[in-house]
């Protein structure tokens, strides 16, 4: 790193090669230790720590945690036995000759010392406090690492895409409101009272226009905005690595994306074996109870619908019955099985049926007595369980029961310590339905259109070749040319082949219950562009916050965003959202009433 007015070196640049030389350093006082008239300061900057030795008590006396200081001194080897093998600079120290306090610090609301990094996270305050003082929270080395990792990943992605002849293009932030599956954030247009801009949920339509414009390979790290109910894994504003290509099909996009992912992971020291595995959407739901399956461990779901087709147990007289094995679960106390019932109810289920296989194959548990002798005798073999195991069941509609069992599968793996954050299990999920029911209780997306069907991905997704001529005759079974990339049970991104023919687009909109007049009003500009020769095109977007959090092994995407929002979209740091003044309301026209002008 280059020398500046305040330093000759960064902390971790001070090595054995500089022993006997004078250096000037600048940074924060990470912590201070006093030993018999000698003070030791850990000086911290963005690169790490270096130990400073101060023999002058008057020089050391005013120094406190998080004071910003500049020190000049000579580098020397630490005395034998005093090396710190955990530090990059653990073999040397700097003997201070001069120290200047550049800025003082008040008492901290919480400690950010590197010395606490390897201790329990319980040392940290609640997340609201961390977010209120985010500038302090970001001083912690783990947070600095995440921000640096995010930057390095972006650099690797850019290099990979530019090597494949992609062009980075910035698309507008103020656009017209268009249907994309969530609520828009809107901004008043001061110069056009009563009119509003929308912040883009994605650059979807704009990047399609770029394909029509002749930009055959486009990308950007795009800021996106969605006004949806807050969930732990969502942010109202987020970033995605957006990519689109002309004259390509699904295979081309998937191959390109794999190269980008491999380059990103390589930048962090990991090798990704290509090509990545694939699974169909149906198989993912049937085997893992999720359209974003975690493949770091096995234990697939077992369908028992046929097995229980003549069951006397009314709960299992359902369209779907499935199970997941709880290895060694027979030793689980009854109170823990009761806690599983609460866990299931928190997810909207009525409960979680179970049996246990005791010694000598004896079947126990609340469900056992409700089964026929034939069902009890063959159950262990049917589910692949062993003596000492337990089995959880779910029955009901196929999707809701599978989703519950999929959540059980992951929760069991978590409790068994099988979710290694340093192991990365990628898979493509392909062959998605084109549409989904509008009234799906397990879906929180905003329906696009006014019919019983809404888009599984978005209204501009191309039907698969086998369905182009008939998707509007059988929307329930129609399939699409779409694909998601999944890692460790998280959806990293998704994409599709886009509709480039206005006749197909019109039929899709008709299935969604969007009239021609409504389509022209909301995105007529795209339909108009298609009339002038739109090339076949396809693309994909990676959720950047999610992708970084997976590679960082972070518990939350908020740990890889510099200034994230808390629950409900609140910003404890700045106090946003906040009321605006009466003057601002009048100036921006948020209360504009067109009827008042007529009167």
Curated annotation (Swiss-Prot):
What GO terms are given for molecular function? aspartate-tRNA ligase activity; aspartate-tRNA(Asn) ligase activity; ATP binding; nucleic acid binding
Please tell me whether the keyword Glycoprotein is annotated for this protein.
Answer: no
Q: Which organism is it from?
A: Bifidobacterium longum (strain DJO10A)
Q: What is this protein called?
A: Aspartate--tRNA(Asp/Asn) ligase
Which transformation does this protein catalyse, written as a reaction? Answer: tRNA(Asx) + L-aspartate + ATP = L-aspartyl-tRNA(Asx) + AMP + diphosphate
Give the start-end ranges of region Aspartate: 204-207
Amino-acid positions noted as binding ATP in the UniProt annotation, renumbered to this chain: 226-228, 235, 491, 543-546
Q: Which gene encodes it?
A: aspS
GO cellular component entries: cytoplasm
UniProt record similarity statement:
Belongs to the class-II aminoacyl-tRNA synthetase family. Type 1 subfamily.
According to its UniProt record, this protein's enzyme class is ligase
Function as written in the Swiss-Prot or TrEMBL entry:
Aspartyl-tRNA synthetase with relaxed tRNA specificity since it is able to aspartylate not only its cognate tRNA(Asp) but also tRNA(Asn). Reaction proceeds in two steps: L-aspartate is first activated by ATP to form Asp-AMP and then transferred to the acceptor end of tRNA(Asp/Asn).
